[in-house]
Structures are given as C-alpha cells and as structure tokens.
Amino acid sequence: MKETLPKSVQELILSLREKLKDEPEIVDMFERCYSNTLDTTVKKMEDGSTYVITGDIPAMWLRDSVAQLRPYLVPAQNDPELADLIAGLIRRQFMCINIDPYANAFNEGSNGNCWEKDETDMGPWIWERKYEIDSLCYPLQFSYLFWKNTGRTDQFDEVFWEGVDKILTVFETEMNHEEKSPYSFIRKNCSYTDTLSRDGKGAQVKSGIGLIWSGFRPSDDSCRYGYLIPSNMFAVVVLNYLKEIADFVGGKEEIAKKAEEMAKTVKQAIETYGTTHIWGLGDVYAYEVDGFGQYNLMDDANVPSLLAMSYLGYEPESQEVADNTRKLILSEANPFYYSGTKLSGIGSPHTPVRYVWHISKAIEGLTAPTKEEKHQMIHELMATDGGTGLMHEGVFVDDPTVYTREWFSWANAMFCELVMQYCGYEIKK
C-alpha cells in the first residue's frame, strides 16, 4: 500500500481486506482504482480550491469531478485534511458556475484552452460550453452530501449562494427555452451529436410544461429531444436538497420556497410528460421527450441515467413504472444495450457500437436488489479491465482488451463505490 495515501484511506483499504479476505483480488483492484484519483487527477490550488482533471483530458468537468471524489466522502467523515480537499473542490465548482453556468468543463486557469473553437459565448476559463442540466446538479448534490457526511457547513458561503442564484435562474429560463434562453451552441465539421440543430437552439420543445431543457446529455452528446428525463429527475432531487440546506442555514426563505416549488413542478411534469406505454410491458419512463408527444426510448451509460434513478435518489410516483423501465433498458429493446461473449450491458452513442461502459455496469450493481447481483457486477468489471488493473470508458463486448480511454477516473470511482457499498460502506444521504 502506498504510504502517500491519507491514513484514513489506508485504514479503509485495510478494513476492506479484512471483509474480503477470501477475495483479495477485489481489494487489489479497489486499491489501484481508489488511489489513482488522488495520485493522478487532483491538484490543490494556491487559493485553497481543488482542481480535478477527468483523466486523459486536461480539464475539469463539473460532473466527473464530483463522481471522482464522491467515494472519499466515507473516509472524510473522520479525516479533516481529506475533507478540506473535498471542500476545495466544491469551492472550485461554484467559482466555475459563477463564471458561466452554461459551461460543462473548465480550465485550471484563464488560459484560453478549449476542446474546439465553438460558436457560443466562450471565455478563457472555459474548456467546453455544452449546457447540461447535470453539470449544475452535481455540485449541489456534492455540497449536500459533504454536509451530511462530515457535518461541515463552511461550503455554504457567498460563492455557493451566488452560484445557487445562477443555477435557479438557468433552470427557470430553460423551462421556457424557446422564448427566453440566451444559449446556443454550434460546432463546425463534426458529428451531429456534437452540435445543436436550428442555428444552435436544438430541436424544438414545448415550453412552459414544467420540464427543464438541456442541450446535451451527460455523455456530452446532444439531446435528440431537449427534455432529458433522467437529468430532470436529478434536478428534482437536488432542488429538494437545496431546500433542506436553505432551511438549515436560515435567512434563505425565498430560495427555499423557490427550490421547493420548482422541485414539485418538475416532478409533476416528469410524471405527466415523461412516461409512455409499451405494449406487453406497461408504462415506462422515456429517456427524452419534446412535450409535443415524441419520445426517445433508450438509456445511456452516463449518469444521470434511467438505470441510475434510485442511485440518484429520485422517488417515482409508481414503482411499477420504474421497474418496467429497468426491464426495458436492460434488454435489447434499448438500442444501446449490447450482449457479447465477455460482457453485456448498456453502452452509449458516444462510443462505438457493441461497447459497454464500466460506469453502467457499476450502476447496475449499485442499484441491484441483491448482494449476489452486486458481487456478480464486481467480478464482471474486474474480468473486463483489459489487463490494466483499472476501469475504462467503453469496452468491446467480445474482447475486453479493446476499449476506449485508458485513463478514465470517473469509471474507477464508480467501481470503488460499488465495492464499498457491497462491504457496507454507504455514503450518508
């Protein structure tokens, strides 16, 4: 074990070795994945914030950076130094949101680096400006979970509340995207999934129905229909978190009321517009809708996803609809569900056909109803590492040595969270 790891992390690994003494190979993989994030992606900044790159791309995604450090919330409960590192990330995330709440990925400094010279309101801090609902949900979720797991509230500072105002403004605006949104995005000479149609506004949706518009999915692919149901589910969860935070802090009655009302509005819209009936199965949640009656029935490996509904904390009005949805997306009725000789599961249009993502296999395990299924998912992940000892993005279903992204910290973190849950280490919510 690396002596450079925080003592709390070393103690967690030793505890897992005791719990899994008959399967040391699981802990070996866990240790590699768990230490990889701290060793290779995390940087403490001079201003006290924490910058976390996604892996083999030198930029910080608001979404990925939360997922990367989320498994450290457990040891941070008794490790103030590790907790400071996490608090630094929260501070950095809200600094970024205050720069531009429509951007999904940010540079370490104001250096002008970017993925592409896109036609949108870019700035020198912004690596990419794809507006995704989840990019605003994840920092709110992390701030809340940090409070619940460490008891700390110093993250709820002026920078946080300024960011909250921007998040609520964006959500309100994007409920009426067609009429009110200032956002557009055009990328030239690219796949259609990397840009938005209609001069950068995206496919038309019905405004004012209570759903929040998103330009892009958590895969960074453009939405077919702008009302992305899993991301709206995530918004409901974090808006309720925000209401609880505002009530606890005090003096934020207006924000608490706005968050509560918005959560109710979005949830009602999900249950009204976000479901459809499948013959022989019943009612299911769609992945995307436009409010005019068109539905996109699929699921994507990236989180938020329909598969991750319970993991995110969304409570459906009907558990039967949620169960039907799970059956649908874990079958070939989902166009991105693939089966091969080595692996079966959910992939993404972001990667080649017949590539299953390690993230989706981890979510399948985290949301599985039995410990036996969780154990099976752990072993499927380990058996498809391509001999690297780490997780990847997409893995070819017939040959695990063929994969995308050798260094993908988000997937490593998801494997770790699954192992921790299997061994009884739950992140407090």
Predicted segments with their positions:
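Low-complexity, Ser/Thr/Pro/Gly-enriched N-terminal "stalk/linker" regions
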Residues: 1-63, 88
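Hydrophobic core segments within long, regular secondary-structure runs in both alpha-
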Residues: 10-13, 27-35, 69, 73, ...
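Extended ligand-binding clefts on enzyme/binding-domain cores
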Residues: 62, 101-102, 109, 115, ...
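C-terminal capping/lid segments that line or modulate ligand- or cofactor-binding pockets
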Residues: 117-124, 129-132, 296-316, 354-429
